Amino acid sequence: MAKGYWIVRVDIADPERYKAYTTANARPMARYGARFLVRAGKFENPEGGSRTRNAVIEFPSYQAAVDCWHSAEYQEVLKLRVPVSTADLIIIEGYDGPQPA
């Protein structure tokens, strides 16, 4: 079964208040089996637009990624992030097919 991912790009207006979100999101993320593959860190943006912070979060399945986003628990936590940041987030299914040789 293919995994699911959140790909997130964020500009943070208030880093101190944003910390409350990063602390609070741990519980719903753990509940749905989330694992951070990328959490901030250095990046290069050779094409298109970007934001100042990036994250890639892996879930055991696409459905788990969707369910986490729509859960009442995460939606409550999201209220901490929205006033202090601007984000782009997509939920995407991973690829399990053949790879180039």
List each model region and its residues:
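C-terminal structural segments of small proteins and small subunits
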Residues: 66, 73-91
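Short S/T/G/P-rich N-terminal loop/turn motif that feeds into the first structured element of a domain
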Residues: 1-53, 60-70, 93-101
